[in-house]
Amino acid sequence: MTQLSVVILAAGKGTRMYSDLPKVLHTVAGKPMVQHVIDTAKQIDAKQIHLIYGHGGELLQQRLSSEPVNWVLQAEQLGTGHAMQQAAPFFADDENILMLYGDAPLITKETLERLIAAKPENGIALLTVELENPTGYGRIIRENGSVVAIVEQKDANAEQLKIREVNTGVMVASGASFKKWLANLNNNNAQGEYYITDVIAMANQDGYKVQAVQASEFMEVEGANNRLQLAALERFYQKTQAEKLLLAGVRLIDQARFDIRGSLTHGKDVEIDVNVIIEGEVKLGNRVRIGAGCVLKNCEIGDDVEIKPYSVIEDAVVGKAAQIGPFSRLRPGANLAEETHVGNFVEIKNAQVGKGSKVNHLTYVGDAEVGSNCNIGAGVITCNYDGANKFKTIIGNNVFVGSDSQLVAPVTIADGATIGAGATVTKDVAENELVISRVPQRHIQGWQRPTKKK
């Protein structure tokens, strides 16, 4: 099987974005456009990915530092053909070279596999798309199924203007062919640039076949040159992902008000209300219900869990039949066992909460272990930080912590203990002990409230 290398053009400045950020680093579904393209290139088993960079190259390399790409500098942006010329020295004669664009993030593995499979032994496979309104695009001229020319709008005659099949710029050819044609490109045109589309005419002159393959959807090959086009790509992507989830059995209350910025694995009878955002890798069990306005990132949610509105869960695990929210925050390292309750304005970070325990109101639990069947009252704080270091709070099983208590770590509260409301606990508590540390209540007879001065 012929090896494949991919060239991704990513040197453009993106002037119409009106941004200091390189164009290809603008995001779709929470991920830079060029990252989408790199990920797709990996899926088709590219031996090598050559990334052409220019404007904002330092930032681009910083953001993609973990990617195994060959960085190729295009110091001057003199057209698509010029960009390919910079990568040509790295091409092996006997490999296939696939040319992609860093600002066209939605191209799919399946489309690229069809394109590569269609490449003639000696020739080019060119990706095209059919448009309802092809105005402004180069028309594909065919003879006997083979592409013989790409005619730009301004050069097309009346018959050619009726053609709806247009060029996307995505193509695949052998390394030897590309090197030959790229060496013969010239910039004798109004823009003074080197156009990759000129290789189509060269291939025909050499007697090579140019095979066109049509993309099934225009948005798959659409690029983003401005914020409006970027927003259109985002909406198309979200619509596509929502439709996949609906067809897989997830109930989305309103598919137009749901965003996924990663991957979602789910069980049966999952229900997701409006304005929910999924980020990173999220796993939902069976019969999970997610209320409006929740954000879930890199988390695992067990069967029969209810997440009430406006809760945020990040890098956390929630056990079966738990109830979360509304307005709860689970931070990285939160691990909730089965049948736990976490209520409104509760924050849990780097803590384990045992089966059946309840943390229902206005509470912070951080760097802690909470046993099973505990009740943590409203306003309880685990004081885990002394300004320099963090310390752990350990709470056993069947512990009751009264409202407005402070547990100053490091501290251990053993099984069955009761902490009276308003206590400040600085020492370990033994099993079944009651701790009270409040000022004795005073009664002042005949007290008169102050009155306002007139």
From Swiss-Prot:
Q: Where is this region: Pyrophosphorylase?
A: 1-227
Provide a GO CC annotation, any one.
Answer: cytoplasm
- Location of the active site: 361
Q: Which cofactor does it need?
A: Mg(2+)
Q: Its GO biological process terms?
A: cell morphogenesis; cell wall organization; lipid A biosynthetic process; peptidoglycan biosynthetic process; regulation of cell shape; UDP-N-acetylglucosamine biosynthetic process
Binding of acetyl-CoA: at which residues?
A: 378, 384-385, 403, 421, 438
Any Pfam family matching the protein = NTP_transf_3
Instruction: List the residue ranges of the region (N-acetyltransferase).
Output: 249-454
**Pathway assigned in UniProt:** Nucleotide-sugar biosynthesis; UDP-N-acetyl-alpha-D-glucosamine biosynthesis; N-acetyl-alpha-D-glucosamine 1-phosphate from alpha-D-glucosamine 6-phosphate (route II): step 2/2; Nucleotide-sugar biosynthesis; UDP-N-acetyl-alpha-D-glucosamine biosynthesis; UDP-N-acetyl-alpha-D-glucosamine from N-acetyl-alpha-D-glucosamine 1-phosphate: step 1/1; Bacterial outer membrane biogenesis; LPS lipid A biosynthesis
Per the similarity annotation, which family is this? In the N-terminal section; belongs to the N-acetylglucosamine-1-phosphate uridyltransferase family. In the C-terminal section; belongs to the transferase hexapeptide repeat family.
Q: How does it assemble?
A: Homotrimer.
What is the official name of this protein in its record?
A: Bifunctional protein GlmU
Q: Which organism is it from?
A: Actinobacillus pleuropneumoniae serotype 7 (strain AP76)
Q: What is the lineage of its organism?
A: Bacteria, Pseudomonadati, Pseudomonadota, Gammaproteobacteria, Pasteurellales
| Gene giving rise to this polypeptide | glmU
